[in-house]
Amino acid sequence: MPTPSMEDYIEQIYILIEEKGYARVSDIAEALSVHPSSVTKMVQKLDKDEYLVYEKYRGLVLTPKGKKIGQRLVYRHELLEQFLRLIGVNEENIYHDVEGIEHHLSWNAIDRIGDLVQYFQEDERRIEALRNIQKRNEQGE
């Protein structure tokens, strides 16, 4: 199982490959706001752990194992953003909040959050009812 730091790298590499067709060390460093030397060290570790194949100066490719985890990590991130929007978290807080919680939830918790998001999306009246509760609670403060 990858560490939270490894997950951040795998997720970002997956996103870059999906968007651009490739992921370079410099692109990863820029996206994660870290030094290229840190990226190189982590990429070597991810290569050793078979999440990707890295050839110096030639780039990297996610293995099937890395792709599968990358997809799941992107899903988790997007689901948590969706959930926080659904429950009315201010837009300017969402990214930071997701980054703060995503590594601390079990996959079981993520799946249950997915169920809850689906529950609300299946009937707009449920979302309206939640908004009404939130308005009442805010007025009561």
UniProtKB/Swiss-Prot annotation:
Keyword RNA-binding appears in the UniProt entry: no
UniProt-recorded Gene Ontology molecular function terms: DNA binding; DNA-binding transcription factor activity; manganese ion binding; protein dimerization activity
GO biological process, one term: intracellular manganese ion homeostasis
Entry's Gene Ontology cellular component terms: cytoplasm
Activity regulation details: DNA binding is strongly activated by Mn(2+).
Binding site for Mn(2+) 2: E11, H77, E99, E102
Pfam families given in the database record: Fe_dep_repr_C, Fe_dep_repress
Predominant location: cytoplasm
Domain HTH dtxR-type: from-to ranges: 1-63
Subcellular location: Cytoplasm
The keyword Manganese is annotated on this UniProt entry: yes
Keywords noted in UniProt: Activator, Cytoplasm, DNA-binding, Manganese, Metal-binding, Repressor, Transcription, Transcription regulation
Coiled coil: none
Source domain of life: Bacteria
Residues involved in Mn(2+) 1 binding: D8, E99, E102, H103
Family assignment from sequence similarity: Belongs to the DtxR/MntR family.
Quaternary structure and interacting proteins, as annotated: Homodimer.
Protein role: Central regulator of manganese homeostasis.
Protein known as: HTH-type transcriptional regulator MntR
Naturally occurring in which organism (per UniProt): Geobacillus thermodenitrificans (strain NG80-2)
Gene responsible for this protein: mntR
